[in-house]
């Protein structure tokens, strides 16, 4: 979920939040931090205002209560928010839990973790299907010219002539760089109001400024492109 920036090699490199959900588990190990907090998964209605979905529990890992999470972005590209957070919020249907994380580490493009109070494989297996959320404030800090996708969604896009081009509705990773999906109101062939889309590469040659405070992105892009 990152992209190469031909005008600014960092813009758009770290990305997260607009994702393709990964349906499978994968494998390989690297250590992350651990916390000496105690507790157990507990039902909660107190959902953080800045909660961002970052993955889903897909399996147990080992015999001692660890879970395996398929992440929506690789570690180092936003998925490491799971490693940074000491508390996860879990949702499966109408069921919501809050859980402290004792240890976590990467295993290929998954994250494996030990939730407090989950002590055996059966308990870990019972957590399959939970979607995993962390607070936006738990995402690792980025350099000034790097952005998480989740922070770009909904921003207004205008060109250098101040012509409104639409709003960012999503992001695409084409393997080389990130691409903004910019939706704007249009008229269909039947004369009825509809929504159309522009695809604008999120690279320095086109993206001139990203002002998150003003919720605006300025691009070098004509309205008739």
Swiss-Prot record:
Residues 144-225 form the PRC barrel domain. GO terms for molecular function: ribosome binding. Transmembrane segments: none annotated. InterPro entries: PRC_barrel-like_sf, PRC_RimM, RimM, RimM_N, RimM_N_sf, Transl_B-barrel_sf. GO terms for biological process: ribosomal small subunit biogenesis; rRNA processing. Keywords: Chaperone, Cytoplasm, Ribosome biogenesis, rRNA processing. Pfam families: PRC_RimM, RimM. GO terms for cellular component: cytoplasm; ribosome. It is found in: Cytoplasm. Belongs to the RimM family. Binds ribosomal protein uS19. The PRC barrel domain binds ribosomal protein uS19. An accessory protein needed during the final step in the assembly of 30S ribosomal subunit, possibly for assembly of the head region. Essential for efficient processing of 16S rRNA. May be needed both before and after RbfA during the maturation of 16S rRNA. It has affinity for free ribosomal 30S subunits but not for 70S ribosomes. This is Ribosome maturation factor RimM.
């Amino acid at each position: 979920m990152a992209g190469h920036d031909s005008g600014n090699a960092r813009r758009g490199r770290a990305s997260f939040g607009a994702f393709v959900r990964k349906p499978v588990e994968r494998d390989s190990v690297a250590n992350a931090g651990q916390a000496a907090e105690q507790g157990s998964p507990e039902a909660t209605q107190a959902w953080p205002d800045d909660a961002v979905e970052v993955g889903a529990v897909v399996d147990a890992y080992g015999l001692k209560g660890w879970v395996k999470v398929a992440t929506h972005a690789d570690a180092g590209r936003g998925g490491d928010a799971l490693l940074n957070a000491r508390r996860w919020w879990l949702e499966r249907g109408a069921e919501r839990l809050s859980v402290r994380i004792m240890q976590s580490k990467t295993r290929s493009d998954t994250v494996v973790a030990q939730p407090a109070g989950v002590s055996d494989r059966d308990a870990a297996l019972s957590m399959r299907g939970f979607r995993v959320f962390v607070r936006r404030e738990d995402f690792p800090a980025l350099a000034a010219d790097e952005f998480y996708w989740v922070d770009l969604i909904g921003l207004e896009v205008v060109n250098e002539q101040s012509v409104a081009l639409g709003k960012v509705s999503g992001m695409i990773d084409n393997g080389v760089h990130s691409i903004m999906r910019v939706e704007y109101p249009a008229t269909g062939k039947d004369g009825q109001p509809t929504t159309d889309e522009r695809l604008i590469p999120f690279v320095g040659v086109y993206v001139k400024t990203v002002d998150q405070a003003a919720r605006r992105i300025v691009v070098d892009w004509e309205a008739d492109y």
